[in-house]
């Protein structure tokens, strides 16, 4: 930004600091206020709703000003960060009382959407990830860091893999090379906060050295990243950004985990959204997370979000989780003991981070001690359980007894939220501190004693000893008794009805008291700093405790879901079979009225006999719910949860793909046929033998012919794919697809049943073998409140179209067509209505698909049937097409 002409020393200092962070809002500490100036003040006043004013800035100059009290920082800072602003906090670096010149100021922290440890900025149930993406020609690196927890990860892969990670981890801020910003936007279409860094911040060699330096290593083999140069480049960019934002205390970032796509089920952004895993698509709806998250600690809440979007592909790890859930399910007493003590732990993970960064408050130090005390009974239950995996988890809990006992001895149990706001260090810790406190806190007794002494000496019964900030300690005498005042008293202030005096004894006492308070503050600060330093020695075991508690909390949550919702333990194995008996949708079931049972359904899929199920049925019958519940049950099984069914066997799934139709809450701007085809293409290009594929109403965004053709060919492709036979559910209103059952061995028709009783729809919501020939669209339109005359007219038209279809079917040759592809019935599936000269359909006319007796059409048909396509040259084809055009024109 251009440097304005400035006059006052304060504003000169402000603009010098502002020039170093032109893209951040600068909160400039002036006395007891944080002030913003110029453009920052205008922006801050709009976001924070604070008054915008102006102040003089030298001769004939004014500058915009907006500010708030320093103690309100925790209130206003989150609002700026959530608005996507970077905020530079500029504090006074020296005591204004000790300098006669301009107070020295400097940036103490740069807070951004992705880099914050402020509790009011952070969400307790979500991670606050900062991401960096390094862009290569084909391979991209990605690194993610939550500075508030110390979680640091890196990986690399193609653009699709990076997009999946961005979708599932939901970083609050992404770092990109400035020269690659345009390409990044074209590839990922990220709508969140992006920060462009200079290209040097993504230097491959420099960033490798930066990562090695942070961990004090000579090789990254221990992290499994030695050969992943793009991943390491991204990780180095994250560390460079922390340097830039003045975050230098990073002892809690103790490891760099490799993001390995082979460990987890592939879920793309469309699947996460359409299955409503983390958030509902409709306002007031519920997500899977809302239903199964019964975690107690913030660490558990954050962990379960990650587990949901990263299901496991290793049956052994899945079964290990299941066995712990089973133990908790069958042992309610142990479950209750652990749950009770988890409530006492709080956010241990972020407390450890604050301790490592030297920012833990006295009150938080007490909470850390409470958390460590709560770990002991939890460890006791776990290590004595008759379940091996739970014992292993309990063995990871470090009680850190020395630290716990030290905090118990040295910190007041009711310690204040900050140093200087009350006593922090307990009595008996330091003899000097105890002496100073005795001196400072005995003031009331001393003043009462002095006051009584002077009353007796002077004979003034109304004499009063008091204190204020202006004059300090003084003796007040009413005017009626001022003739009794001793000569050695010094008059300090004259009031209307009284005089105020000081004495040498009072002056000495005041100096002693005020000096003691300053010494108490300094000594408490020193003793507390030593305690924080001791805590920092325990960062690694405390982080291990946090991880173990998070996992324990999630498994306890799964057991609670099983208890509440009648979930069962599924079998997860290496087979290719999905066999669900009486499966239920975990979210919809919990939203039904108490007296309305959920209609359960069976699903069987494999790769040998029943690979593809075509599901037909009317709107509102439950087709979409059936598809989604199959995917959700499979996903829940592979995160280690119990599932809503009577029994379930899940042959391990390595990817779940979904494609929902345009009416199924596709966000605005994406409900186009092109996007539908792009998503379908993405699925077809990434199929594996273990994929689970859900197509819901594919092809509705175009004409009927086009839609049927595309849907038909996709089912054929999935069935005939030589490399993979993915298990597939295909819900459709194109009843013509039912013909595929007779042509493709592993395709089977099912329908979600509905009945029309006395002109009213009865949705049975039961999956039955066989295809459906009716969509009951008109009945659904009636239920939706469509005007009666429109419903009646639609009914008449439907009857005529059905009669015409029956007529055509009767005229079809009875010979069996052995060719694969749609029958003549499907090909002639688009009837037309005769119209008058204004284009309106003529009521009462016989409807027809084609004017079959039209001689022109008969001639064209004969011309086409007589063609020998195998011997036709391109030129002859064009000539024949021209002949047909002449026939249509009538010459």
Curated annotation (Swiss-Prot):
<dbReference type="InterPro" id="IPR007860">
    <property type="entry name" value="DNA_mmatch_repair_MutS_con_dom"/>
</dbReference>
<comment type="similarity">
    <text>Belongs to the DNA mismatch repair MutS family.</text>
</comment>
<dbReference type="InterPro" id="IPR036678">
    <property type="entry name" value="MutS_con_dom_sf"/>
</dbReference>
<dbReference type="InterPro" id="IPR017261">
    <property type="entry name" value="DNA_mismatch_repair_MutS/MSH"/>
</dbReference>
<dbReference type="Pfam" id="PF01624">
    <property type="entry name" value="MutS_I"/>
</dbReference>
<dbReference type="Pfam" id="PF05192">
    <property type="entry name" value="MutS_III"/>
</dbReference>
<keyword id="KW-0234">DNA repair</keyword>
<dbReference type="GO" id="GO:0006298">
    <property type="term" value="P:mismatch repair"/>
</dbReference>
<dbReference type="InterPro" id="IPR016151">
    <property type="entry name" value="DNA_mismatch_repair_MutS_N"/>
</dbReference>
<feature type="binding site">
    <location>
        <begin position="617"/>
        <end position="624"/>
    </location>
    <ligand>
        <name>ATP</name>
    </ligand>
</feature>
<dbReference type="Pfam" id="PF05190">
    <property type="entry name" value="MutS_IV"/>
</dbReference>
<feature type="compositionally biased region" description="Basic and acidic residues">
    <location>
        <begin position="805"/>
        <end position="827"/>
    </location>
</feature>
<dbReference type="Pfam" id="PF05188">
    <property type="entry name" value="MutS_II"/>
</dbReference>
<keyword id="KW-0238">DNA-binding</keyword>
<keyword id="KW-0547">Nucleotide-binding</keyword>
<dbReference type="InterPro" id="IPR036187">
    <property type="entry name" value="DNA_mismatch_repair_MutS_sf"/>
</dbReference>
<dbReference type="InterPro" id="IPR005748">
    <property type="entry name" value="DNA_mismatch_repair_MutS"/>
</dbReference>
<dbReference type="GO" id="GO:0030983">
    <property type="term" value="F:mismatched DNA binding"/>
</dbReference>
<dbReference type="Pfam" id="PF00488">
    <property type="entry name" value="MutS_V"/>
</dbReference>
<keyword id="KW-0067">ATP-binding</keyword>
<dbReference type="GO" id="GO:0005524">
    <property type="term" value="F:ATP binding"/>
</dbReference>
<dbReference type="GO" id="GO:0003684">
    <property type="term" value="F:damaged DNA binding"/>
</dbReference>
<comment type="function">
    <text>This protein is involved in the repair of mismatches in DNA. It is possible that it carries out the mismatch recognition step. This protein has a weak ATPase activity.</text>
</comment>
<dbReference type="InterPro" id="IPR007695">
    <property type="entry name" value="DNA_mismatch_repair_MutS-lik_N"/>
</dbReference>
<protein>
    <recommendedName>
        <fullName>DNA mismatch repair protein MutS</fullName>
    </recommendedName>
</protein>
<dbReference type="InterPro" id="IPR045076">
    <property type="entry name" value="MutS"/>
</dbReference>
<dbReference type="InterPro" id="IPR007861">
    <property type="entry name" value="DNA_mismatch_repair_MutS_clamp"/>
</dbReference>
<dbReference type="GO" id="GO:0140664">
    <property type="term" value="F:ATP-dependent DNA damage sensor activity"/>
</dbReference>
<dbReference type="InterPro" id="IPR000432">
    <property type="entry name" value="DNA_mismatch_repair_MutS_C"/>
</dbReference>
<dbReference type="InterPro" id="IPR007696">
    <property type="entry name" value="DNA_mismatch_repair_MutS_core"/>
</dbReference>
<keyword id="KW-0227">DNA damage</keyword>
<dbReference type="InterPro" id="IPR027417">
    <property type="entry name" value="P-loop_NTPase"/>
</dbReference>
<dbReference type="GO" id="GO:0005829">
    <property type="term" value="C:cytosol"/>
</dbReference>
<feature type="region of interest" description="Disordered">
    <location>
        <begin position="805"/>
        <end position="840"/>
    </location>
</feature>
């Amino acid at each position: 930004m251009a440097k304005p002409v400035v006059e006052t020393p304060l504003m000169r200092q402000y603009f010098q600091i502002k020039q170093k962070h032109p893209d951040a809002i600068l909160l400039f500490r002036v006395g007891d206020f944080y002030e913003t100036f110029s453009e920052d003040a205008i922006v801050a006043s709009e976001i924070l709703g604070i008054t915008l004013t102006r102040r003089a800035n030298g001769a004939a100059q004014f500058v915009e000003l907006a500010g708030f009290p320093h103690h309100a920082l925790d209130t206003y800072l989150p609002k700026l960060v959530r608005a996507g602003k970077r905020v530079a906090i500029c504090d006074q670096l020296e005591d204004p009382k000790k300098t006669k010149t301009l107070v020295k100021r400097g940036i103490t922290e740069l807070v951004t959407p992705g880099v914050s440890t402020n509790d009011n900025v952070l969400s307790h149930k979500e991670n606050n990830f900062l991401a960096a993406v390094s862009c290569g020609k084909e391979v991209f690196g990605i690194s993610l860091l939550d500075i508030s927890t110390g979680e640091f990860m890196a990986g690399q892969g193609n653009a699709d893999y990076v997009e999946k990670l961005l979708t599932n981890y939901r970083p609050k801020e992404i770092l990109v090379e400035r020269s690659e910003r345009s390409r990044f936007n074209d590839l990922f279409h990220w709508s969140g906060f992006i920060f462009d860094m200079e290209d040097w911040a993504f230097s491959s060699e420099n960033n490798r050295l930066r990562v090695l330096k942070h961990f004090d290593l000579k090789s990254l083999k221990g992290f499994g990243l030695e050969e992943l140069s793009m991943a390491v480049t991204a990780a180095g960019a994250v560390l460079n950004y922390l340097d830039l934002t003045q975050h230098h205390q990073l002892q809690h970032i103790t490891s760099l985990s490799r993001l390995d796509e082979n460990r987890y089920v592939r879920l793309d952004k469309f699947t996460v959204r359409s299955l409503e895993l983390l958030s509902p698509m409709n306002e007031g709806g519920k997500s899977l997370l809302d239903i199964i998250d019964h975690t107690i600690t913030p660490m558990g809440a954050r962990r379960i979000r990650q587990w949901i979007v990263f299901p496991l592909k290793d049956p052994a790890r899945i079964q290990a989780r299941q066995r712990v859930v089973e133990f908790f399910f069958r042992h309610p007493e142990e479950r209750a003991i652990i749950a009770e003590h988890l409530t006492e732990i709080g956010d241990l993970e972020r407390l450890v981070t604050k301790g490592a960064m030297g920012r833990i408050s006295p009150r938080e130090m007490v909470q850390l001690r409470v958390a460590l005390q709560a770990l002991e009974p939890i460890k006791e239950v776990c290590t004595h359980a008759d379940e091996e995996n739970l014992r292993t988890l309990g063995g990871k809990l470090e009680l850190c007894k020395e630290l716990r006992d030290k905090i118990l001895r040295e910190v007041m149990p009711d310690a204040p939220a900050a140093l200087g706001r009350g006593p922090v260090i307990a009595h008996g810790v330091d003899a000097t501190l105890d002496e100073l406190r005795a001196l400072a806190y005995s003031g009331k007794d001393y003043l009462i004693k002095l006051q009584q002494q002077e009353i007796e000496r002077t004979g003034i019964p109304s004499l009063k000893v008091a204190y204020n900030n202006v004059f300090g300690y003084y003796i007040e005498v009413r005017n009626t008794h001022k003739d009794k005042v001793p000569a050695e008293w010094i008059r300090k202030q004259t009031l209307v009805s009284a005089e105020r005096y000081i004495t040498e004894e009072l002056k000495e006492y005041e100096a002693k008291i005020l000096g003691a308070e300053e010494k108490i503050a300094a000594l408490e600060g020193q003793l507390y700093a030593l305690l924080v330093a001791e805590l920092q020695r325990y960062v690694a075991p405390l982080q291990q405790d946090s991880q173990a508690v998070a996992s324990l909390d999630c498994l306890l949550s799964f057991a609670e879901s099983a208890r509440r919702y009648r979930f069962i333990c599924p079998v997860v194995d290496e087979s290719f079979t999905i066999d669900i008996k009486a499966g239920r949708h975990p979210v919809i079931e919990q939203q039904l009225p108490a007296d309305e049972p959920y209609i359960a359904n069976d699903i069987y899929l494999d790769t040998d006999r029943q690979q593809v199920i075509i599901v037909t049925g009317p709107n509102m019958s439950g087709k979409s719910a059936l598809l989604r519940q199959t995917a959700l049950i499979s996903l829940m099984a592979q995160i280690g949860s119990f599932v809503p069914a009577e029994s379930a066997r899940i042959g391990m799934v390595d990817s779940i793909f979904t494609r929902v139709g345009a009416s199924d809450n596709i966000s605005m701007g994406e409900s186009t046929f092109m996007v539908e085809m792009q998503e379908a293409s993405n699925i077809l290009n990434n199929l594996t033998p273990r994929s689970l594929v859900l197509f819901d109403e594919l092809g509705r965004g175009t004409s009927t012919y086009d839609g049927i053709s595309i849907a038909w060919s996709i089912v054929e492709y999935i069935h005939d794919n030589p490399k993979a036979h993915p298990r597939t559910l295909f819900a459709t209103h194109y009843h013509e697809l039912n013909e595929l059952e007779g042509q493709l061995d592993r395709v089977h028709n099912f329908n979600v049943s509905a009945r029309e009783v006395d002109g009213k729809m009865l949705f049975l919501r039961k999956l039955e073998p066989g295809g459906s020939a009716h969509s009951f669209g008109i009945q659904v339109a009636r239920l939706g409140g469509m005007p009666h005359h429109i419903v009646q007219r639609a009914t008449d038209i439907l009857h005529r179209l059905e009669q015409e279809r029956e007529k055509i079917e009767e005229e079809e040759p009875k010979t069996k067509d052995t060719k694969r592809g749609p029958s003549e019935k499907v090909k002639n599936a688009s009837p037309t209505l005769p119209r008058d000269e204004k284009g309106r359909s003529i009521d009462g006319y016989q409807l027809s698909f084609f004017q079959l007796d039209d001689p022109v059409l008969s001639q064209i048909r004969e011309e086409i049937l007589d063609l020998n396509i195998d011997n036709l040259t391109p030129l002859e084809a064009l000539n024949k097409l021209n002949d047909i055009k002449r026939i249509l024109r009538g010459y």
